UniProtKB/Swiss-Prot annotation:
The keyword Ion transport does not apply. It comes from Methanosphaera stadtmanae (strain ATCC 43021 / DSM 3091 / JCM 11832 / MCB-3). The active site is at K253 (n6-amp-lysine intermediate). InterPro entries: ATP-dep_DNA_ligase, DNA_ligae_ATP-dep_bac/arc, DNA_ligase_ATP-dep, DNA_ligase_ATP-dep_C, DNA_ligase_ATP-dep_cent, DNA_ligase_ATP-dep_CS, DNA_ligase_ATP-dep_N, DNA_ligase_N_sf. This is DNA ligase. Keywords: ATP-binding, Cell cycle, Cell division, DNA damage, DNA recombination, DNA repair, DNA replication, Ligase, Magnesium, Metal-binding, Nucleotide-binding. Its EC number is 6.5.1.1. The gene is lig.
Length: 557
């Protein structure tokens, strides 16, 4: 077995980015996976991560903690160029990866200790930065970066930087990787797709695929390892949804954070829909769940809401609880929580592939309800009694909840999939979850704040973000200040008024209508956009897509 050079991976990155054809990208990745199987099979897991632009698995809560500013400092230390000069270049180009490539290419200094980089070395150095804390942590992180940049070729420097900034820009989405893994190891795509859905780990899927098809098929949901949530499409209307689905579970849609609760080895962990571990922030939820369910291995799913006088209050209050790291007991008294459970994905064994009607029955059998833990309010509805759904909708809104859900009674749980087996119906204006990719400073009293944000949707075919609209209304002074402080840490480049950001923060945007527009990359814009709030409960893989935009255009016709 060889120790695969990082240069070899970079060559693959360049080949992939040089073509716009998804099939060609798939072929390149499949060929590379076969090469790795034959020459360095132990790193298949890591290679699959790096092809996604990641260094940690998606279910891990580890992060590098390396900012663009830290990269600039490292390159400045290495090359003797001022940080201001590098910042100016970044403002002009907008891609820190390209800047890194250019700086290394133009470096006139001779390096006597240049050692060829390997995939293992790059990953090792980047992963080490995650655990560094303390007063000299920045210097230690810079030293790990310098080790890499000192030995890197210009192209290697470009992709090291892009991996750190989580913007690989090679146009590869999860779908392409699934297809490539299936092709490389000659396994049906459906088998690979199922294994990925149940494990949420393409690295694990690829590693098992190189062993055998049986190993892939044995992958399943495991307590302690969160999976992507099943997602809902928009409902065209109550009667229309029930007519199409025939028989449904109709249940209240709560305005809180969706959680996946895992109990295993006599401990309980709570994950958000973006797979973030928030167990420490919600200690009472752990207590409530351990009182409500038997001490067996299980995974249940539900919604945690904030309450006042036992009534639901704004979603933003529960976000305060989730993000809190200190004074948890004080916040626990200030913002009480309640749990509504609506699904069980594992109970002594996997249950996700059972029909939802059976999973609901199991949930009712195993949960002891209380004032702190309840099951979601639901009714089984068909075309003959669809008015029951209308009554539940009215009741849910009157009680301060968000709307209702429709779930086809025969449907299994499909992690990460958005399909017609689960629909959501809400009143008033529609919303889109958009990622902030740019901004503009305000004027007058608001000159030191970002007064408007450029928002984008995900192009699922390329993995890139396409601009959709500028939004400014809906921010009170507190949100204006807190969001500015947060976004300043994510600046990629800026001119006098305009700023580009690393895609990280997601906003929920309400609007009245989708209209065609040549001003934005998506080809559309929103009329009367208003910022409803920050969606810290979801990850970048749940940013709304161009496909959803087109679906909503069809619905408004």
């Amino acid at each position: 077995m060889t120790n695969t050079s990082y240069e070899k991976l970079v060559e693959v990155y360049e080949k992939i980015s040089s073509t716009s054809s998804r099939l060609e990208k798939q072929d390149i990745i499949a060929d590379f996976l076969m090469y790795i199987k034959e020459t360095d099979a132990d790193i298949t897991y890591d290679i699959t991560l790096l092809l996604q632009g990641k260094i940690f698995p998606p279910w891990s809560d580890k992060e590098m903690g390396i900012s663009t500013q830290l990269i600039i400092k490292a390159l400045s230390n290495l090359l003797g160029e001022s940080t201001k000069s590098i910042e100016n270049k970044l403002a002009e180009v907008g891609d820190m990866g390209e800047i890194s490539e250019e700086l290394i290419k133009n470096n006139k200094q001779v390096t006597f200790f240049k050692v060829p980089l390997t995939v293992k070395k790059v990953l090792s150095n980047l992963r080490k930065t995650e655990s560094i804390t303390g007063s000299k942590s920045q210097n230690k992180k810079i030293n790990y970066l310098l080790e890499l940049y000192t030995s890197a070729s210009p192209l290697e420097a470009k992709y090291i930087t892009r991996t750190i900034t989580e913007r690989l820009r090679i146009g590869v989405g999860e779908g392409t990787l699934v297809e490539a893994i299936a092709q490389a190891y000659n396994i049906d795509k459906e088998i690979i797709d199922r294994a990925y859905m149940l494990s949420n780990d393409l690295g694990e899927v690829a590693s098992r695929a190189q062993e055998s098809i049986e190993s892939v098929k044995s992958l399943t949901i495991t307590p302690g390892k969160p999976i992507k949530p099943m997602l809902a499409q928009l409902s065209p209307g109550i009667k229309e949804s029930i007519t199409e689905m025939k028989k449904v579970i109709c249940e209240t849609k709560y305005d809180g954070i969706r959680v996946q609760i895992h109990h295993y080895n006599n401990k309980t962990k709570i994950f958000t829909r973006r797979l973030e571990n928030v167990t420490n922030a919600l200690p009472e939820v752990v207590e409530y769940i351990e009182e409500a369910l038997p001490s067996k291995d299980f995974i249940v799913e539900g919604e945690v809401i904030a309450t006042k006088d036992n009534k639901p209050i704004s979603f933003q209050y529960i976000l305060q609880r989730v993000k809190r790291k200190y004074d948890i007991d004080k916040m626990r008294e200030k913002i009480p929580l309640k749990v509504f459970l609506f699904d069980v994905l594992y109970y002594d064994k996997p249950t996700a592939e059972l029909p939802i009607i059976q999973r609901r029955q199991l949930l009712e059998e195993i949960v002891t309800t209380s004032k702190n833990v309840e099951l979601s309010t639901m009714k089984i509805v068909s075309q003959e009694n669809y008015t029951e759904a209308e009554k539940l909708f009215t009741w849910s809104i009157d009680e301060g909840h968000e709307g209702i859900m429709f779930k086809d009674v025969t449907s299994p749980y499909s992690p990460g999939k958005r399909g017609k087996n689960m629909l959501k119906y809400k009143p008033l204006r529609e919303t889109l979850d958009c990622v902030i990719t740019g901004g503009t400073y305000g004027k007058g009293k608001r000159a030191k704040f970002f007064g408007s944000y450029l928002l984008s949707l995900l192009d699922e075919k390329t993995g890139e973000y396409k601009t959709l609209v500028h939004a400014a209304t809906g921010m009170d002074d507190d949100l204006l200040a807190s969001l500015t402080k947060r976004m300043e840490k994510l600046i990629i480049s800026k001119s006098e008024q305009n700023v580009l950001f690393k895609p990280k923060v997601i906003l929920e945007i309400a609007y009245s209508e989708i209209v065609e527009s040549n001003e934005y990359e998506s080809g559309y814009s929103l009329r009367f956009p208003a910022i409803k709030g920050v969606r810290d409960d979801i990850g970048l893989d749940e940013v709304d897509t161009l496909s959803k935009l087109h679906q909503m255009i069809d619905l408004q016709k």
